[in-house]
């Protein structure tokens, strides 16, 4: 494996001499991370600087567009720390995020009020706020939206909060549409591209004709496996309160995700007063029709409920000698089948996170299938 380093202008700066360890985490619905530990050498100290871009070359298949261009995931260094242990060994630690974190450099302005699919909404907000249709100061340089397969989806009545975080809104629409995203780099052309996609169906009974991908210790393609089934954070019915009308009445809508009753009914409240019925379009004040506004509140409710679902997940350490190869037979975002005969469990789930660990010349791959449990920070944000 080789780690290459670039400037933000995608000018090649060199390759890392050697590393002690690398943790490379990619996520389907969220921003990935990395953590790298390397001995201090003149070359490493020169390259591992805050702000530089790193890419990982390990011989695995990357994203290739129809024009033959090769795009790969990359990360930006945001943290550098130098340590010296009791034996006098000096090491350099670098940490950072995959490039989709750049989306949070922008607030959405002007406000978007639009009816479309989640895929179209994501492309629209990216294009308007950091793409070709953004103002000259707000454009990301060397950046474009990569060609995409059209994904089937229902129409959504959407309105964002004024000056909403672009990254957070893209994440919300991606989760609602079951879409993955990232910003990729083209080293040869010195370009960046917004990548929006939907993983393949590789489940045991898929109807698309794809070769099934089944992870099980019985097939010797999994070394370790953990299973989690949690309803600790589960809600299935939400009340959404909108902004006050001129008569001070506040409309309330509900979203019912399960048609449950009795003890099975789990209710939650969401205040959506940040979604106003009136907004500015140029110099004109526009009033959203009540029926459209209520549909927007329901969209907010559906988005909120996405974070309150049952958490069912497998976390597996995949054997590097297995019959299934990462990025050849399966990839981040694909839906696969997990099977554990002894536990009596078989589920179809999406690969939502992949952790690649490189240490002492050895590689391990750990994949999360399904939804991982929310962190304490995520729970606090939800309560707020």
Language-model segment annotations:
Residues 50-149:
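Surface-exposed cap/loop segments at beta↔alpha junctions
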Residues 1-8, 193-194, 237-239, 336:
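Short polybasic amphipathic segments
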Residues 70-72, 76-103, 141-236, 244, ...:
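Short beta-strand-centered interaction patches in the first periplasmic/extracellular domains
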Residues 20-47, 168, 217-384:
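An acidic/polar, Gly/Ser/Thr-rich interaction patch typically located in mid-to-C-terminal regions
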Residues 7-11, 56-68, 242-246, 338-342:
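Short acidic, glycine-rich loop/turn motifs
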Residues 1-17, 204-210:
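Polar/acidic, low-complexity leader/linker segments enriched in S/T/G and N/D
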Residues 44-60, 104-114, 204-219, 329-337, ...:
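Extended Gly/Ser/Thr-rich low-complexity repeat segments
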Residues 118-123, 127, 163-170, 294, ...:
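Generic alpha-helical secondary structure
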């Amino acid at each position: 494996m080789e780690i290459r380093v670039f400037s933000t202008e995608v000018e090649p700066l060199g390759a890392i001499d050697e590393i002690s360890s690398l943790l490379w985490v990619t996520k389907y619905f969220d921003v990935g991370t990395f953590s790298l530990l390397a001995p201090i050498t003149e070359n490493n100290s020169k390259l591992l600087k805050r702000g530089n871009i790193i890419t990982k070359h390990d011989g695995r298949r990357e994203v290739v567009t129809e024009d033959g261009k090769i795009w790969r995931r990359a990360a930006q260094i945001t943290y550098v720390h130098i340590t010296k242990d009791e034996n006098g060994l000096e090491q350099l630690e670098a940490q950072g995020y995959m490039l989709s974190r750049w989306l949070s450099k922008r607030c959405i302005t002007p406000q978007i009020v639009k009816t479309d699919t989640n895929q179209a909404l994501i492309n629209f907000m990216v294009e308007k706020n950091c793409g070709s249709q953004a103002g000259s100061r707000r454009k990301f340089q060397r950046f474009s939206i990569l060609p995409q397969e059209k994904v089937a989806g229902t129409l959504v009545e959407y309105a964002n909060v004024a000056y909403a975080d672009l990254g957070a809104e893209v994440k919300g629409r991606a989760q609602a549409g079951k879409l993955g995203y990232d910003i990729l780099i083209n080293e040869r052309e010195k370009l960046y591209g917004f990548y929006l996609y939907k993983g393949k169906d590789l489940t045991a009974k898929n109807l698309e004709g794809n070769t099934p991908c089944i992870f099980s210790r019985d097939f010797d393609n999994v070394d370790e496996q953990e299973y989690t089934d949690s309803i600790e954070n589960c809600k299935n019915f939400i009340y959404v309160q909108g902004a006050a009308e001129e008569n001070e009445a506040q409309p309330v809508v509900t979203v019912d995700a399960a048609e449950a009753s009795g003890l099975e009914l789990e209710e939650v409240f969401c205040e959506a007063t940040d979604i106003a019925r009136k907004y500015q379009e140029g110099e004109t004040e526009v009033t959203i029709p009540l029926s459209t506004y209520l549909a927007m509140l329901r969209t907010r409710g559906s988005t909120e409920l996405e974070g309150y679902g049952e958490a069912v997940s497998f976390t597996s350490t995949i054997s590097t000698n297995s019959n299934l190869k990462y990025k050849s037979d399966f990839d981040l975002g694909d839906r696969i089948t997990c099977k554990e005969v002894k536990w009596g469990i078989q589920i179809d789930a999406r690969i939502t996170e992949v952790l690649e660990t490189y240490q002492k010349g050895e590689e391990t791959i750990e994949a999360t299938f399904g939804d991982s449990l929310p962190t304490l920070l995520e729970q606090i944000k939800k309560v707020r």
